[in-house]
Amino acid sequence: QQRKKNMTLKIPRNQPPGKEATIVVAGTTHHHPEAWKWYDYFTFNVDHKVIGIQYLVTAFLFYLIGGLMAVAMRAELATPDADLLDPNLYNAFMTNHGTIMIFLWIVPSAIGGFGNFLVPLMVGARDMAFPKLNAIAFWLNPPAGLLILASFFFGGSQSGWTAYPPLSLVTAPIAQSLWILAIVLVGTSSILGSLNFVITILFMKVPSMKWDQVPLFCWAILATSVLALLSTPVLAAGLVLLLFDLNFGTSFFKPDAGGNVVIYQHLFWFYSHPAVYLMILPIFGIMSEVIPVHARKPIFGYKAIAYSSLAICVVGLFVWVHHMFTSGTPGWMRMFFTISTLIVAVPTGVKIFGWVATLWGGKIRFTSAMLFAIGLLMMFVMGGLSGVTMGTAPFDVHVHDTYYVVAHFHYVLFGGSVFGIYAGIYHWFPKITGRMMNETLGRIHFILTFIGTNLTFLPMHELGLQGMPRRVAMYDPQFTHLNEICTIGAYILGISVIPFTINALWSWIGGKQAGDNPWNALTLEWTTSSPIGKFYLW
């Protein structure tokens, strides 16, 4: 019970849905439902917990759409000829698969979903600094997704998720314009959300919480938000200029009219390589919370892991040109960005070392969350090793635009980011819903996902080394066998989503009741009731 001036707030803990919190103001009693109703999640709600769940559910729906596009592409690539999809439709699927997975699945779920739900709870704040701005940031995402889907009615954007001109200027201009507008909306959402996170973490944490007590997830979100604020406006500027070239007769990037396509690449990659860290830094934060809890051992090297997030934020702004080693980059620039690319691996290695040291000697519980965390360690190290090879200009020149790049990218972002999102869902599901997920279905989900990931993406390294170009619907028949293996793996990945979806829905509706702190975790969000109602106290 809390008393402040003439207000009395009575909040029953661990009560079943339907109970009410009683607020007495100036002698008048007001009754408020303790639990949110299902329809509250479809409204312009300013509660950070509701917004976090809105992000997670919406992002997962887009994940299913992007996954269907991926399975369709892999079905096409099972044979050398374009006998299933029209090549133009294949290009549209390829473009929008990448766009949806990056901008509407990983970024919204990792930052918007977990960040909004957890950050205020972890730092002891009542809500985000700007609740209405927070809601606006979320509601910019669904229209962006609808614009991307609507682009298929106009031929679909076919220039890849990078939208390089001049290709993006000559294929399906209406669809390309819709695609640009969608990314600008998502970018605006990212800027608003990042500003909110920075203010919340810096100025709204409880005064008694010292900086060396701030949860590592919050350090990761802080670094991610600063990086997004510095890089996202640059992408928005480049895309707006591209939109002008498409619709208003300008020639910023038209080579035949004096435009410079390399300038676009600089503008795009100044954001889009830091975007990789936007997608993986929050996952690093999730790992730093999940591993010590399920290893039942304090995190090893707290300060090193916290500061390494900030180091990645800084160094990550100076590595973008390694995507442009084949774009006529001068030798001195190749040398500088090769070195900076290798340097960024150092703070990442600090995190890996800290997690492995935490596991060493721990009393590990092989829960679904822990299995995905350990799987992420293996997948990300694999992706990191291939990334170090591509960071060196002499090697990158040979494998650029081959399937070697596709393999590396997916080991980092699927084996890294998606595994981490799954780990976070299994870990915080009891706090979000008040229910436990089924561990048997969770382990089946992990096994299928782990096998499918390696079967899909491991052979792509060999395909790239043999010279198979990426982003093609037809290929030389000599690559058929390895592509068949990749397609089988993609089918397994598609099937792996089924037990997870069943598990999440069934557990949310009728799963085993969870206690306030089923994992015996130590961060502040676990001191509230499960699920957290409209009002909560620590």
Residue ranges, per PLM feature:
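...captures the hydrophobic TM-helix bundle architecture rather than a specific catalytic motif
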Residues: R3-W538
